[in-house]
């Protein structure tokens, strides 16, 4: 008989031992929660054109929750470090979620009551500080460079959100002034400038006011081809406005979408997708008025 051949009796004996091991293994830890149903019922398309971009077997996941968290906002993804940075405005800190093990740790404290965050195309973090009424950049060594603090010799109201132009690396930001309305999310003080959208030139540092034809400019983003700028109005407008980008100027401003009919009270962060570029369709997160795009 071939020595490598296992006879039937030995095979059955081995299988019996293996089966016993499986039978005595620890019972699975069933939590009692209902299994996740796909597609996730919390993924809702207000426009049916968005349906084809859903990933049907992906649920909405909570990355962070804490009884100490007061108001988390301004998330920005770092594609090199594979981490998400976000602000807790009243707690005056920034937190970081790391992809490899889902841990969340304090990233920066104090943060100047930062709200919106983003990264430029050299990987440096840009933050809008409510408490100090300015836009700053964090260098590779962690030092802070002030990019915008005043305009026409007056302090900004409280910069809120920023986006970096992919073509010329300029920084475009909104200044609605929420961080100066109370001490809860900044430092209470008078608003000396009309709420507006601004641009910081990447080379000269010159600050240009682009438009103040909006009540409370909040979240903002460019269309994928950079030809248009979307800005959400979290004030009386409760809408998303869009302008044509003409170099360093905006023109032909108009309402892109009204948010007044949404049950969620407001829009916050805006983002566009390349696939929807033909329609220049931004997506948003509603939270209390027109907020982020």
Residue ranges, per PLM feature:
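N-terminal secretory signal peptides and thylakoid transit peptides that target proteins
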Residues: 2-18
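Blade/loop signatures of beta-propeller domains
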Residues: 30-58
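Beta-rich, blade/repeat-based domains predominating
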Residues: 66-82, 110-129, 134, 152-171, ...
């Amino acid at each position: 008989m071939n020595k490598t051949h296992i006879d039937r009796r030995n095979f059955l004996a081995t299988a019996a031992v293996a089966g016993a091991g499986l039978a005595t293994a620890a019972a699975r830890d069933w939590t009692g929660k209902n299994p996740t149903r796909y597609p996730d019922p919390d993924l809702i398309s207000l426009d049916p054109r968005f349906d084809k971009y859903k990933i049907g077997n992906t649920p909405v996941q909570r990355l962070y929750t804490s009884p100490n968290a007061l108001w988390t906002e301004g998330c920005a993804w770092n594609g090199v470090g594979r981490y998400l940075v976000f602000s807790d405005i009243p707690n005056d800190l920034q937190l970081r979620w790391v992809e490899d093990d889902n841990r969340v740790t304090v990233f920066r404290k104090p943060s100047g009551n930062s709200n919106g965050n983003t990264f430029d195309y050299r990987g440096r973090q840009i933050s809008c500080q409510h408490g100090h009424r300015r836009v700053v950049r964090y260098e590779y060594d962690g030092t802070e460079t002030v990019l915008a603090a005043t305009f026409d010799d007056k302090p900004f109201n409280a910069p809120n959100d920023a986006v970096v132009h992919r073509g010329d690396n300029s920084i475009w930001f909104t200044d609605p002034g929420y961080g100066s309305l109370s001490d809860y999310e900044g430092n209470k003080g008078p608003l000396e400038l009309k709420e507006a959208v601004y641009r910081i030139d990447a080379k000269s540092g010159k600050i240009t006011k682009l438009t103040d034809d909006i009540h409370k400019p909040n979240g903002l983003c460019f269309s994928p081809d950079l030809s248009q700028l979307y800005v959400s109005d979290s004030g009386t407008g409760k809408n998303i406005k869009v302008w044509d980008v003409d170099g360093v100027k905006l023109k032909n401003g108009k309402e892109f979408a009204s948010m007044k009919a949404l049950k969620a009270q407001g829009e916050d962060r805006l983002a566009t997708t390349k696939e929807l570029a033909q329609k220049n369709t931004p997506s948003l997160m509603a939270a209390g008025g027109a907020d982020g795009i």
